[in-house]
Regions:
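Flexible "cap/lid" loop of the alpha/beta hydrolase fold
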Residues: 1-20, 47-50, 76, 84, ...
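Helix-loop "lid/cap" segments that line or gate small-molecule binding pockets
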Residues: 21-30
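Alpha-helical elements of Rossmann-like donor-binding domains used by nucleotide-donor carbohydrate transfer enzymes
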Residues: 22, 38, 80-83, 108, ...
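Active-site nucleophile elbow and catalytic-triad environment of alpha/beta-hydrolase enzymes
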Residues: 41-59
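Short, proline-enriched alpha-helix->beta-strand connector loops that line the catalytic pocket
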Residues: 60-65, 87-91
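Conserved strand-to-loop "acid loop" that flanks and positions the catalytic carboxylate
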Residues: 64-73
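C-terminal and late-domain segments of enzyme folds
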Residues: 74-75, 81-90
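Catalytic active-site module of serine/aspartate enzymes centered on a nucleophile-bearing elbow/loop
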Residues: 90-129
Length: 129
């Protein structure tokens, strides 16, 4: 699967953007074009620091984790997503979706979030009992 790295462009001030013309194909291929275009023109840049900052205490090492693999993602290779989910021992689901899987598959995303929230609520109740 080709990566979308050529669509990510630096702006010279330490931020990166996804090229508006390539946004739909590389980032949001499975949603209606008008929604992808709106996302492209309203995107918030990502800081270079996001790619280089070292995380010293990742939460996934000590907390339960859930992950939705986007099997048609062109921004993060789906095999990399699967590896990250496995490493985190995450409860994992997989959808045939682009990087914006939470938009193209809202029911699946909501169900996974509800499962995580229910698990956390039950865990908290046991601790407080």
């Amino acid at each position: 699967m080709p990566q979308a790295s050529k669509a990510f462009k630096p702006d010279g001030s330490g931020n990166w953007w996804i090229d508006e013309e390539q946004f739909a194909a590389d980032f949001a291929a499975d949603i209606p074009p008008e929604k992808a275009w709106f996302m492209a023109i309203s995107q918030v840049p990502i800081s270079t620091d996001s790619f280089t900052h070292k995380v010293t205490k990742p939460a996934w090492k000590t907390k339960p984790t859930w992950y939705m693999v986007a099997a048609a993602d062109r921004s993060i290779n789906p095999n990399q997503e699967r590896m990250m989910a496995k490493r985190a021992r995450a409860k994992t689901i997989e959808v045939n979706a682009s990087h914006v899987a939470y938009i193209s598959h809202p029911q699946e995303a909501a169900k996974l979030i509800e499962e995580a929230a229910t698990f956390e609520a039950a865990s908290t109740a046991q601790v407080n009992a």
